[in-house]
């Protein structure tokens, strides 16, 4: 399962990146970092993480909660969404 993790840096970006430099991502085995982008003001990070066991994600977030507020949203790929939610003709503009 993939998750969109919206991270808000509660004390700014500097302490988050300082810890990252010192300790790395601190992700437990089985939790995969996929990709991320950061807002230009450095206040938030939008990360895609993947794991089969949600408790791995919870354990990872616990190590960062003193610096980061998290919102977790289960996500699927656009291709999977097109297959799952499309009705016949909806993608071609037919009604």
What do these predicted ranges mean?
Residues 67-78:
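Conserved short beta-strand edge segments in small beta-sheet-based binding/regulatory domains
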Residues 61:
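Short, flexible helix/strand-to-coil boundary loops that buttress conserved ligand/catalytic motifs
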Residues 1-34, 38-44, 52-56, 76-95:
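Short S/T/G/P-rich N-terminal loop/turn motif that feeds into the first structured element of a domain
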Residues 16, 58, 69-71:
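A short, polar/proline- and glycine-enriched secondary-structure boundary/capping micro-motif
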């Amino acid at each position: 399962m993939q998750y969109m993790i919206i991270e808000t840096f509660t004390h700014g970006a500097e302490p988050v990146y300082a810890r990252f430099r010192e300790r790395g991502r601190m992700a437990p085995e089985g939790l995969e970092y996929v990709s991320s982008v950061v807002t230009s003001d450095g206040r938030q990070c939008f990360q895609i993480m993947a794991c089969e066991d949600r408790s791995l994600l919870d354990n990872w977030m616990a190590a960062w909660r003193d610096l980061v507020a998290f919102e977790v949203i289960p996500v699927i790929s656009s291709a999977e969404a097109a297959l799952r939610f499309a009705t016949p003709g909806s993608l071609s503009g037919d009604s």
